């Protein structure tokens, strides 16, 4: 149920080492005003909806099926939020959840850990976040990475995200780090909006006086210019956790950007990390997205093992899930990473995965 796409030897070793281990799940929430740009994302039908996507996903992740929510899941043009996949699996498998607010407009209405960050300005400003905030969030990431690793000895930590517009800030980080990512990233749209993303990124890097890129850019300054608050927390968390335990960066484009950021930070700031213990895990809808090139992107970053769950919705009775097979939604809130964990740690089959996810979707449908 798990495919290794790059760095096959490292990926297979990582999977073998963590087979039957019980993971911990961390989800880092963040917001960037980049997500409010018209048509930038399908994670919410309108810009107004997208203000609340991360908060609504977080509320559903923690509460599951309830009769009412403070922030109901926003309507999507097609399909359902990937949080249905994540919630179904963490609930069924009783995986511990740690929810982090790295920087949101509004705090989530459920128990969470506030890291003292702020929501990011649109990356087109070239001034997404103050450098003091970036440094603070990185230290918070290091602190919690070390703390969670202690709770997961001889196991692994799943680090996930929920940031609307995050594949665009990911493209900005990758581009700023000198990685050829144009035309290779993914999005929640069935056809990735590459031209729009590239134009936005060029504007932001130009405003920050980083474009054209003629020399290496300090990674902290880069995130401060065109990034989002999740990225630097995830990087710090993975760096610290990798010193003691395995790390599964659960996501596609966004977590590949985090991995590239990790490499830049440990190079520029001599932070110790064990990159052999860090892999990126996503869905096959991302890994095999014909409108992007996730595998090529991972190869361009270098020395990162890209894994993906083989989870399929082709035979699903739920049309909201079958639409994933047409390229809608694809990933988010650690959905791919949780499906990988279900197969790796608990031996779940395609049938078990589908049954758990469909049960949750149907329960929600019956209630409303």
UniProtKB/Swiss-Prot annotation:
Domain of life: Bacteria
One Gene Ontology molecular-function label: nicotinate-nucleotide-dimethylbenzimidazole phosphoribosyltransferase activity
CDD domains, per database record: DMB-PRT_CobT
Record-annotated disulphide pairs: none
InterPro entries: Nict_dMeBzImd_PRibTrfase, Nict_dMeBzImd_PRibTrfase_arc, Nict_dMeBzImd_PRibTrfase_sf
Family of this protein: Belongs to the UPF0284 family.
Protein name: UPF0284 protein PCC8801_3324
Species annotation: Rippkaea orientalis (strain PCC 8801 / RF-1) (Cyanothece sp. (strain PCC 8801))
